[in-house]
Amino acid sequence: MSLQVALLLLLRCLASALAQYELCKSLVSTDEGSVWEHYACQPKATSMKDYMRIKVDPPGITCGNPPERFCTLENPYLCSDECDASNPDLAHPPQLMQDKERNGLITYWQTVTWRRHPEPLLANITLSWNKSLELTDDLHITFEYGRPTIMVLDKSMDHGRSWQPYQYYADDCLDAFNMQPKRVRDLSPTNITRVICTEQYSRWVGSKNEKNVKFEVRSRFAVFAGPRLQQMDNLYTRMESMKGLRDFFTFTNLRLRLLRPALGGTYVQRDNLLKYFYAISNIDVPARCKCNLHASQCLLVDGNLQCQCEHNTTGQDCQRCKKGFKAKSWKAGSYLPTPNGTPNTSNVCDEEMLLCQNGGTCFQNQKCICPPEFKGVLCQQSRCEAGKDCNSASSLDLSTALLLLCTLLTHLLATLSPH
């Protein structure tokens, strides 16, 4: 065993001990030598705000063209602030919802004021990734100058061709949507995917006291994994057994429908409509690429997120077999059995063009068992490099030592882990 392979083994062992479903494969020792063992795998969660494309409509809803003054609900008659699209210091374009704020300076997108009341002040914000994603934590929308009194969060799973409501928000759910108000904590394992209306994020408490509107993901996970999410195996088991649960957290696009702005805890005051508008400083979407449990990495390729597929799969979401592998054998990976899951790997020797080489034999129509002097998926590579001694016993000694060290590391990390 070369030092490079030894280090690879050690690193993969350490990574496997640290996290679930972050490895697609690792080298294991068998009677036939070291072979790849495949696992269900998924990319790490990250903030998707840097990758989202923002579209705001209707046209002209963003303030500043023409320039206009506005007030705040706390100081409704001090209308000294101005929005001017032609002045970078006074402009509030949509991209300020996803920029990195520096030196404590808050930047935000802002709409025109409600000067056309009683015509509704409506705005749609569509977030697109051109990629299937899965929510992994709470979605946060940060509003400046007050949260909307009525709003809807929609999602699409087909790149915006069709939409479905994700959650309703209102200061009075019964009046706005004819729905009884609920919180996520009111839900049970049997109705955790229910679309609810919540009043939790729409009541007036002052624009500076509470700015965030959330779509709660952690609380939904906690129904299965416990309040501290320490029983993730239970969640992953439910993801497999409960119809619609995985799809509930899956999306390609999100849309905010802003239906009525903050009113300051009272009715619309028609003598001063310059204090009514929407302003958003940040949208944070913690998620991971959906790769059907066939990839541990997701990279930006030509401007689009792309799963780096394993298990003989391909496609943006690893949604089909590689060329030369039977399409009918494709399946999404499974979280079960925990902790490594089932990769549902497409067979490596199910086509004539993929017959094992150099005297290798096909084992259970899944992998090639190679003669001692050859290696590789199809036994296509010689184990002995030119000019090197292939009969040294040091390889066996190093392999044994690594396996012992790997076992010790796994037990040590399991002892230290809160899970």
Language model segments and positions:
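Aromatic, loop-rich ligand-recognition surfaces of beta-strand-rich domains
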Residues: 2-51, 60-65, 77, 101-172, ...
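Non-cytosolic beta-sandwich-type ligand-binding/adhesion modules
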Residues: 39, 47-51, 55-57, 66-104, ...
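Beta-sandwich interaction modules
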Residues: 121-123, 128-130, 178-264, 270-271
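Flexible, disordered linker segments and immediate boundary regions flanking tandem C2H2 zinc-finger modules
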Residues: 177-180, 328-337, 387-392
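Disulfide-braced loops of extracellular cysteine-rich modules
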Residues: 289-292, 330, 349-358
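C-terminal GPI-anchoring signal of eukaryotic secretory precursors
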Residues: 358, 383-403
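Cleavable C-terminal sorting propeptides in eukaryotic secreted/cell-surface proteins
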Residues: 394-419
